[in-house]
Every structure is written in C-alpha cells, then in structure tokens.
Regions:
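Conserved strand-to-helix beginnings and helix N-cap segments that scaffold or border functional pockets
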Residues: 1, 27-28, 214
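Rossmann-fold NAD(P)-binding glycine/threonine-rich loop
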Residues: 1-14
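Short Gly/charged-rich anion-binding patches and loops
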Residues: 3, 82-85, 212
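Long, low-complexity, intrinsically disordered N-terminal extensions of eukaryotic proteins, enriched
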Residues: 5-6, 21, 32, 244, ...
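Extended hydrophobic/Leu-rich segments
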Residues: 8, 34, 90, 237-238, ...
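Generic structural signal for beta-strand residues in well-ordered domains
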Residues: 8, 38, 58, 92, ...
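Predominantly a Rossmann-like dinucleotide-binding segment in NAD(P)-dependent oxidoreductases
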Residues: 11-16, 21-175
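NAD(P)-dinucleotide binding in Rossmann-like oxidoreductases
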Residues: 103, 109-253
C-alpha cells in the first residue's frame, strides 16, 4: 500500500478505494429509503455475508488470500470490507463509538481432517468421499481456473489435463483443505455501537453452501429485509393507526 501511495505521489495521481456496492440498485435504493425519513432513525442493523464454499476454498483456503503474511490483510479486509463500509454508510448520520470482533479458524483446520488424511489429495484414502478433493474440486469442477492454474505459467487454453494433474501433486491447490498453511479465520463476527445509540452486527461465514449477502435494518417505524442476490427487499412499515405492520416488496429486477 505504501508503494502504491508513493507511486501515486510521484506521478501526481489519486488512488481511490471504491466500495462499489454502494452504487448497486439494491443498496442505493435502501439508502434512499432510510434517508427519506419515513422509517425514522436506525435502531439496529444486521448484515450477513455467506461465502460460497467454491469461492472460499479456491481463494482463502488454497488460494493466495489464505495468508495474511503474504497478502497483508485478514479475511475481513480481504472479503468483507464492502459490508463494514455499507454499515457505516447506511447509518452515516452518526459515527462508530465502540467496535468489538472475534473469529477463528473453525472448519478448515487440521483437527477436522479425517484420520489418515494426507497432505496432498492424490495420495489420500478419503478422496472418494471428500467434497473438497482437489481433483474433483479443481480439475473436474474447475470453479475458478484463472486462479487455480496461474502457477503453471501458461495461457489457460494451452494447459493440458496432464499438466494440471501433475501441478496438483506439488502445489497448494492440490493440498488437503484441512492441512494448508492458511493463517486467517474462516468466520468472523463484528459488533458496532454508534454514537447515537444505534447498533450494527456483521457476520461473515466462509464455506457456506450458498453465497449471499443479507441485510435486516430495524428503524423506529419500520424495517428493511432482503438479499442482494434477489435484487428485491421487503419494506415493512408500522401502521400507527392499526397498531400492526404492512409489508411491501420492492422488486428492482
């Protein structure tokens, strides 16, 4: 980061961190809803990011982002900085006062490896039943090829199947997910208390069956609930005269 800053200063350029989720129809419309004032002030925000197991294993268990030592950032900064930005941006009438966070490596660690599991999948007696077997996961499914095969040093369309098989016998992409040198957490929770008394929580879970970002905002006179993947949310407004609530689906598709 310092190198980038120094080069920008040298060239007279600006370096801007762009948190692009602010500009999606989903979050920008929610922001307008909150700023409109009908729901009153924010009382509580709950944000969840579930990282699909294919993405998580390729990038954060076997991929280069598995190592804070190599990449200079933990999982929260590498994967979830968008969500911490959203929390503060949606509630930008105030500022964070207190922050607490905890997490650990819970799933992808050696204690969870089946008995007799080997360092590399090609030697492992559990290959047939293991959902993370490198040959099924990387070779057959080939979820994110432009990450996996980069170490071979050839254009993707020139790499043969035989070269890929040999590569998996010696590279981290061929290692047991429970035995890599991953040094980051695989799930983390963040709690924030804001200066105006509102609170926010963020849960990031790595290795989920389905990817998704979910948000639930509770305001004085209503709520907003939705998944960005659906590109729609529920606007729940408290009806003061009837002492009940009314739901309206805001579909942005």
């Amino acid at each position: 980061l310092f190198d980038i800053r120094n080069k920008a200063n040298e060239k007279g350029c600006k370096v801007v961190v762009c948190h692009v989720l602010r500009y999606t129809p989903f979050y920008s419309t929610i922001k307008k809803e909150i700023d409109g004032g009908k729901l009153g002030k924010i009382m509580s925000m709950q944000l969840n990011e579930h990282v699909w197991y294919g993405h998580f294993v390729n990038s954060y268990v076997r991929g280069k982002w598995r190592s804070e030592k190599e990449c200079g950032s933990g999982l929260l900064l590498a994967k979830c900085c968008h969500d911490t930005d959203l929390m503060c941006w949606l509630n930008n009438v105030t500022t964070p006062k207190k922050v607490s966070s905890f997490g650990s490596k819970s799933l992808f660690c050696e204690k969870n490896a089946p008995e007799g599991a080997t360092q590399y999948c090609y030697q492992c007696p559990h290959r047939k039943d293991c959902p993370f077997d490198a040959y099924k996961f990387e070779l057959e499914k080939d979820f994110i090829p432009f990450y996996t095969w980069l170490g071979i040093g050839k254009p993707l369309d020139e790499i043969t199947r035989e070269e890929k098989i040999e590569f998996l016998k010696k590279d981290v992409y061929g290692q047991c997910v429970y035995k890599t040198d991953m040094d980051i957490v695989d799930r983390q929770c963040v709690s924030v208390e804001f200066a105006n008394g509102s609170i926010g929580t963020l849960n990031m879970i790595g290795g989920a069956s389905k990817a998704g970002r979910h948000i639930h905002i509770v305001c004085e006179f209503g709520e907003i609930v939705g998944y960005i993947e659906d590109n729609k949310y529920i606007l729940r407004v408290f009806d003061k005269s009837e002492l009940c609530y009314k739901d309206k689906t805001i579909d942005l598709n």
